[in-house]
């Protein structure tokens, strides 16, 4: 069984802006060609290996969620997948219900190929994947002078996340630790 801590991130052109040093009482101008440019990413952190699986999508919705899960299935063929995720409507919507019914058809619950479990409502601090997104956006802010186009911002973000060696004490919340009795 593979446990994946999943979340979506919406990267916008404004995410590259942060704090910079400048002369006092002098505004710093950062040109933005289109503040509405946006890229949605699906990401899941493997609980055991801490490997991060990044996937570009046009939006966060049921169709793209199912596509992401199918893509994750290709990464772990013949392994049951458990997704821990937030309460986004498309995680439990019509497309997901149909996908789960087809994928797990006629199989007992313990043997399902794909299972989705929700974190507590309104508790993003429970999901270590939120910390991955924060690290990626923090990296972007440090690279603001280098990334002149939104395509460069997207490339910088995904390259950083693909190379990231992520560790977090939050992962131990979901993984049993050995204790002497």
Describe these PLM feature segments.
Residues 64-82:
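Short, basic/hydrophobic alpha-helical segments
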Residues 4-6, 72, 83-84, 158-161:
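A generic "structured core" feature
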Residues 1-3, 115, 126-181:
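C-terminal anion-handling pockets and recognition modules
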Residues 27-35, 103-128, 145:
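RNase H-like polynucleotidyl transferase catalytic core
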Residues 7, 79-92, 119-122, 127:
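Acidic/histidine-rich, metal-coordinating catalytic segments
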Residues 14-16, 93-97:
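A short acidic (Asp/Glu
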Residues 1-70:
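Extended, low-complexity cationic-aromatic segments
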Residues 11, 62, 122-128, 150-151:
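A short acidic, often aromatic-flanked loop/helix-cap motif at beta-alpha or helix-coil junctions
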């Amino acid at each position: 069984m593979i446990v994946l801590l999943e979340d979506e991130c919406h990267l916008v052109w404004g995410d590259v802006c942060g704090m910079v040093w400048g002369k006092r009482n002098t505004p710093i101008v950062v040109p933005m060609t289109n503040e509405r440019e946006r890229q949605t990413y699906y990401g899941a952190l493997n609980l055991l290996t801490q490997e991060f699986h990044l996937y570009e999508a046009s939006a966060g919705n049921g169709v793209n969620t199912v596509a992401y899960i199918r893509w994750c299935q290709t990464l772990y063929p013949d392994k049951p997948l458990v997704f821990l995720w937030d309460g986004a409507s498309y995680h439990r919507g019509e497309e997901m219900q149909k996908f789960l019914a087809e994928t797990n058809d006629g199989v007992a619950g313990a043997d399902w190929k794909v299972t989705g479990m929700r974190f507590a409502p309104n508790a993003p601090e429970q999901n270590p994947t939120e910390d991955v997104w924060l690290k990626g956006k923090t990296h972007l802010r440090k690279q603001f002078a280098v990334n002149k186009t939104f395509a460069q911002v997207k490339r910088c973000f995904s390259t950083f996340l693909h190379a990231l060696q992520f560790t977090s004490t939050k992962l131990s919340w979901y993984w049993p630790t050995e204790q002497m009795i």
